[in-house]
Amino acid sequence: MSWQAYVDDHLMCEIEGNHLSAAAIIGHDGVVWAQSATFPQVKPEEITGIMNDFNEPGSLAPTGLYLGGTKYMVIQGEPGAVIRGKKGPGGVTIKKTTMSLIIGIYDEPMTPGQCNMLVERPGDYLLEQGF
């Protein structure tokens, strides 16, 4: 399965009538492996900040998490494994795997729990497969 098919079939799929607004799989180096058409253009420094927070959990909390120029307030995640952010009625979940970042962006009516499930389940699978 291609990385694009993974984004299309596993991240942008329907869950209880809702979809993510955007999703991507990005390498730790910031190279996009695959993304939805709606995924924002990310800046290298944004990926660097995210990777730093995985290595030093809590480092993004004072400044916020930036993705495609949009600022998210960092909320409780899983240190070193998952970063979650909130902005108004939506937010973002980022799951770190061995080689990549699985990113899902959502807006209401999707719930944070639905976003977490869509992002973390395939992320766990990729971890098991060594990706």
From Swiss-Prot:
| InterPro entries the record matches | PFN, PFN_euk, PFN_sf, Profilin_CS
Localization annotation: Cytoplasm, Cytoskeleton
What GO annotations for molecular function exist for this entry? actin monomer binding
Q: Which domain of life is it from?
A: Eukaryota
Q: Which PROSITE patterns match?
A: PROFILIN
Pfam families the UniProt entry points to: Profilin
For the keyword Cytoplasm, the answer is yes
Listed PANTHER family = PROFILIN, PROFILIN-2
Free-text function comment from the UniProt entry: Binds to actin and affects the structure of the cytoskeleton. At high concentrations, profilin prevents the polymerization of actin, whereas it enhances it at low concentrations. By binding to PIP2, it inhibits the formation of IP3 and DG.
| Similarity remark | Belongs to the profilin family.
Q: This chain belongs to which protein, by name?
A: Profilin-1
The species this protein was found in: Ambrosia artemisiifolia
Task: State the taxonomy lineage.
Answer: Eukaryota, Viridiplantae, Streptophyta, Embryophyta, Tracheophyta
